[in-house]
Amino acid sequence: MDFFTNPNVLFYITAYLVGGIPFGYILAKIFAGVDIKQSGSKSIGATNVLRVVKEKDPKLAKKLAIATVVFDALKGAVLVLIAKLLGFPPATWWLIGIMTVLGHCYSPFLKFEGGKGVATGMGVLLVLLPVETIIGIVTWLIVAKTTKISSLSSLSGLVALVVASFIVHPDMPYVHSHAPLLLLAFIIFYKHLPNIKRLLTGQEGKVAA
């Protein structure tokens, strides 16, 4: 079968392109008239949308940040669900999820720059590992409420999710390996390296409520 007509390959390419849709950038540009790629952390995620738009309109900032989380999560969840419904094998579900997160982190529409992959990864994992993801979300909420540091809460939630996966599913369903999850987690951690450096030096900023 020709490489570019292989259904799996076409789905991977589609996942990367859909993952690359910068909803935070689009929403902030259309509804607030700001370019989040030129302000704040320059990330396209919800935290930067909140931080940048809040300077103009605090109420609008919260709405756009929530919308960004929802749309970014849906990118991951919907594509994996479609793959499951179409009967693709489980390994393909994971690869589609990983490609979607890569698209978000390295968007082809933004010169291969993008976000941190947290919300999109959450969408993917809600479909593939719902119990572990809920544990991660609860951890994220607790740390966010306590510290008000977005990166710390996101990374804490991710660590909790990964640890929980070894307890809830010692033998990962279908694929029998934690490698796909660890790869996805690595991508998100890698995108957070600047934040981790600031956390270690006490320079990471908080997000006001």
Curated annotation (Swiss-Prot):
**Location in or out of the cell:** Cell inner membrane
Q: What broad class describes the main subcellular location of this protein? A: membrane
| Annotated membrane topology | Multi-pass membrane protein
Q: What is its EC number?
A: 2.3.1.275
Q: In which pathway does it act?
A: Lipid metabolism; phospholipid metabolism
Q: Does the keyword Protein transport apply?
A: no
**SMART domains the record matches:** G3P_acyltransf
Reactions that this protein is recorded to catalyse: an acyl phosphate + sn-glycerol 3-phosphate = a 1-acyl-sn-glycero-3-phosphate + phosphate
A Gene Ontology biological process in which this protein takes part is: phospholipid biosynthetic process
- A GO molecular-function descriptor: acyl-phosphate glycerol-3-phosphate acyltransferase activity
Q: What keywords is this UniProt entry annotated with?
A: Cell inner membrane, Cell membrane, Lipid biosynthesis, Lipid metabolism, Membrane, Phospholipid biosynthesis, Phospholipid metabolism, Transferase, Transmembrane, Transmembrane helix
| Family annotation (HAMAP family) | PlsY
For this entry, the protein name equals Glycerol-3-phosphate acyltransferase
> What organism is listed for this UniProt entry?
Nitratiruptor sp. (strain SB155-2)
